[in-house]
Amino acid sequence: MPTVDDVLEQVGEFGWFQKQAFLLLCLISASLAPIYVGIVFLGFTPGHYCQNPGVAELSQRCGWSQAEELNYTVPGLGPSDEASFLSQCMRYEVDWNQSTLDCVDPLSSLVANRSQLPLGPCEHGWVYDTPGSSIVTEFNLVCGDAWKVDLFQSCVNLGFFLGSLVVGYIADRFGRKLCLLVTTLVTSVSGVLTAVAPDYTSMLLFRLLQGMVSKGSWVSGYTLITEFVGSGYRRTTAILYQMAFTVGLVGLAGVAYAIPDWRWLQLAVSLPTFLFLLYYWFVPESPRWLLSQKRTTRAVRIMEQIAQKNGKVPPADLKMLCLEEDASEKRSPSFADLFRTPNLRKHTVILMYLWFSCAVLYQGLIMHVGATGANLYLDFFYSSLVEFPAAFIILVTIDRIGRIYPIAASNLVTGAACLLMIFIPHELHWLNVTLACLGRMGATIVLQMVCLVNAELYPTFIRNLGMMVCSALCDLGGIFTPFMVFRLMEVWQALPLILFGVLGLTAGAMTLLLPETKGVALPETIEEAENLGRRKSKAKENTIYLQVQTGKSSST
């Protein structure tokens, strides 16, 4: 009886049908970018200082320039008007409406030295140095409330983590297509609700809801496209699908530049996603999932449609279509199996660390660019472009060099780039951007390749469990990253870079402790997984190597 892969070899592994589905689903991949890293623009913190009643009137009466107004009325400004905690979060406790104040150094008429003036917190809000708006300027998320910006982004990653526990079940129980449509609808609605949220708390809840479903939408699209194409195209298709996310990053920089108001920006990236609901008529259900649910008639009908669109004749035995069974998957997996043997324990711990560190490095470098860049939009744009050569490097090296050395080298490069950035003066901004781009490229390579290695190191019956548990550390890393970046920068601006450097270098060294899996048969049992790197299993090598190329993580 023919399997889906057997039929695809005859009706087209990547024909017109697959190309059309691929392009449509890539739009979903691109739409995740504003959700994943939109904090860079939505949560942009401009220069700010306390608003003082009477200062504007005094400035107008005296004819001060903005620089003179700041110099006379704002405490703690450096020699070059550099921002500090005092200048941004404290104010002179002075009645600026009193008529005795002079226009030339007005505070000198009150005290001989400004340092003798009492200071107090900003009680009347802030003045922001920006023509646009962000959640920071609208809800005054600065000074004592600055941590709420971190929480805004952490809620997205918390949503990713919670959603992964539910969405995978929905996709396996009710189908990839239904899961895609439902999560897309909720993602779109929650995105619009975020844009119109009346207060910070409701905005936070809508953002959490969006995180819970948006990654599920992305994964559903990933699973569908990898199940539509033949085995020879799955790996390349999966990498290109992830590249579509990079296209979304590049486009986000342009959209954010054109729309500096955060509410309109949020609407601009949310409203178009309602069009994905039209996929109900253009993207069919996965034949593989239908076969797993014993719905053979509908699976056969879809395979006939694929053959027709590809201009091929379906095989005569198509009605006997079946799903290839894997006897090893009849064994029930448990969390303890991930730590049952010495090598499995080692692999699990290392993979958890790799997932955690690559999430921190990838998101952390994006946020660091947003917080320190001279030109937010250009710096974000340039650092996003480097993800394209990163994908090319993966395609070139994955079968020629392997997995372990590229992952280790990429981690080491990222860590070294972060540490070098500490010693680069601000005047050499181009060099800082170059190093940030180099680190971003390394983090991108790791993020994409660790997914494949994770699937190749576990035996079949715990492969999906291993993928789910280890990749959960990616979402946990994302939860902590905003606090690591923004709160540590308040202590010392270079402190996050030191942390990133240590994480990257440690991850690079730990990666070398993993066995190379290039060309090695996918392990079927715990014994085979335990012996990876010691000897190559010859059994089923030809057929299982095809599974290695598919990246079975797509089913998680």
Curated annotation (Swiss-Prot):
Expressed in kidney cortex in S1, S2 segments of renal proximal tubules as well as in kidney medulla. Expressed throughout the liver lobuli, in hepatocytes surrounding the central veins. Expressed in enterocytes of villi and crypts in small intestine. Expressed in brain, in some white matter regions like the corpus callosum and in the granular layer of the cerebellum. Expressed in Sertoli cells in testis. Expressed in colon. Expressed in tracheal and bronchial ciliated epithelium in the respiratory tract. The modification Phosphothreonine is found at residue 543. The chain crosses the membrane at residues 22-42, 151-171, 178-198, 212-231, 239-259, 264-284, 349-369, 378-398, 404-424, 430-452, 466-486, 494-514. It catalyses: 1-methylnicotinamide(out) = 1-methylnicotinamide(in); dopamine(out) = dopamine(in); serotonin(out) = serotonin(in); (R)-adrenaline(out) = (R)-adrenaline(in). It is a multi-pass membrane protein. It is found in: Basolateral cell membrane; Apical cell membrane; Lateral cell membrane; Basal cell membrane. Changing residue 322 to S: Reduces the activation by MMTS. Abolishes the activation by MMTs. Choline affinity is increased fivefold by MMTS. Choline affinity is increased fourfold by MMTS. Choline affinity is increased four- to fivefold. Changing residue 227 to D: Loss of TEA and MPP(+) uptake activity. Changing residue 229 to L: Loss of TEA and MPP(+) uptake activity. Keywords: Cell membrane, Glycoprotein, Ion transport, Membrane, Phosphoprotein, Transmembrane, Transmembrane helix, Transport. Optimum pH is 6.0 for the transport of the drug quinidine. No transport activity is observed at pH 7.5, possibly due to the protonation of quininide at pH6.0. TEA transport is independent of any pH. Changing residue 550 to A: No effect of PKC-induced stimulation on ASP uptake. No effect of PKC-induced stimulation on ASP uptake. Significant increase of the ASP uptake by PKA activation. No effect of PKA activation on ASP uptake. One of its GO terms (molecular function) is organic cation transmembrane transporter activity. Changing residue 225 to G: No change in TEA and MPP(+) uptake. One of its GO terms (biological process) is epinephrine transport. Phosphorylation of the transporter leads to changes in its substrate affinity, resulting in a regulation of the transport activity. In contrast with human ortholog, ASP uptake is stimulated by protein kinase A (PKA) and C (PKC) and endogenous tyrosine kinase activation. ASP affinity is induced by PKC-dependent phosphorylation. Inhibited by cGMP, most likely through a cGMP-binding protein that interacts with OCT1. Changing residue 228 to I: No change in TEA and MPP(+) uptake. GO terms for cellular component: apical plasma membrane; basal plasma membrane; basolateral plasma membrane; lateral plasma membrane; plasma membrane; presynapse. A motif (Proline-rich sequence) lies at residues 284-288. Changing residue 218 to L: Decreased guanidine, histamine, serotonin, TEA and MPP(+) uptake. Decreased TEA affinity. No change in MPP(+) affinity. Decreased TEA and MPP(+) Vmax. Residues 1-21, 172-177, 232-238, 285-348, 399-403, 453-465, 515-556 are cytoplasmic. Belongs to the major facilitator (TC 2.A.1) superfamily. Organic cation transporter (TC 2.A.1.19) family. Electrogenic voltage-dependent transporter that mediates the transport of a variety of organic cations such as endogenous bioactive amines, cationic drugs and xenobiotics. Functions as a pH- and Na(+)-independent, bidirectional transporter. Cation cellular uptake or release is driven by the electrochemical potential (i.e. membrane potential and concentration gradient) and substrate selectivity. Hydrophobicity is a major requirement for recognition in polyvalent substrates and inhibitors. A large substrate binding region with partially overlapping binding domains for structurally different substrates is formed by several transmembrane helix domains (TMH) including TMH 2, 4, 10 and 11, and it is alternatingly exposed to the extracellular or intracellular side during substrate transport. Contains one proline-rich sequence (Pro-Glu-Ser-Pro-Arg) that is required for transport activity. Involved in the uptake of clinically used drugs including diabete treatment medicine metformin, neurotoxins 1-methyl-4-phenylpyridinium (MPP(+)) and iobenguane and platinum-based drug cisplatin. Metformin competitively inhibits OCT1-mediated thiamine uptake, leading to a decrease in hepatic steatosis. Plays a role in the anticancer activity of cisplatin and may contribute to antitumor specificity. This is Solute carrier family 22 member 1. It comes from Rattus norvegicus. The lineage of its organism: Eukaryota, Metazoa, Chordata, Craniata, Vertebrata.
